[in-house]
């Protein structure tokens, strides 16, 4: 039987960079790993800042040095996190420092094309379902919107009590090509859950952003770029 593998984990360290970049001894590794998880969950599930969910957080990258922890947020609407004159980001930075007990260097960067980021597309679908939108109409709209933005392919899958049905089921729609086994392909993956009166609905999104060789010659996994393979020459 074929096994489904997370496309991000499948490419990490090969054609995609790591979300956490630091080194630690065996004694400290587990504690720092838990600390990274605390940082990510605190930002994405902030107990007081509900606007963070509307900011469109695509991913959180963490780097560590001897003196500080560098946290990079990639968001669709950075103004909701930065706030007026940077007040909100300073508050968040102080909260993170109190959480982990270390010096935090927090940076926020805007995502250039949010329509091509799988996590942002999944969260957009979740918000539409929470507003009681038709799941089929929502899937079709997101397929068209993502393909119009320049994606090579997209697949959306939902599971749960779709449309308020008594029995849970799974439905999916796709457009274009999604070569999951091709390491050279830029496959982005996102998952979230929609809270509806009937229960939770799981949402999975795969987006084919092209190939690593389309944009540049590539470098290594540290920069998230894949190296080009030399073209074969055939002689007759």
Swiss-Prot record:
It comes from the Bacteria. One of its GO terms (molecular function) is rRNA binding. InterPro entries: KH_dom (IPR004087), KH_dom-like_a/b (IPR015946), KH_dom_type_2 (IPR004044), KH_sf_prok-type (IPR009019), Ribosomal_S3_C_sf (IPR036419), Ribosomal_uS3_bac-typ (IPR005704), Ribosomal_uS3_C (IPR001351), Ribosomal_uS3_CS (IPR018280). Gene3D superfamilies: 3.30.300.20, Ribosomal protein S3, C-terminal domain. The keyword Cell division does not apply. One of its GO terms (biological process) is translation. The keyword Transferase does not apply. Residues 212-236 are annotated as: Disordered. GO terms for cellular component: cytosolic small ribosomal subunit. Keywords: Ribonucleoprotein, Ribosomal protein, RNA-binding, rRNA-binding. CDD domains: KH-II_30S_S3. Residues 39-112 form the KH type-2 domain. HAMAP family: Ribosomal_uS3_B (MF_01309_B). Binds the lower part of the 30S subunit head. Binds mRNA in the 70S ribosome, positioning it for translation. Belongs to the universal ribosomal protein uS3 family. Part of the 30S ribosomal subunit. Forms a tight complex with proteins S10 and S14. PANTHER family: 30S/40S RIBOSOMAL PROTEIN S3, SMALL RIBOSOMAL SUBUNIT PROTEIN US3C. This is Small ribosomal subunit protein uS3. It comes from Rhodopirellula baltica (strain DSM 10527 / NCIMB 13988 / SH1). The gene is rpsC.
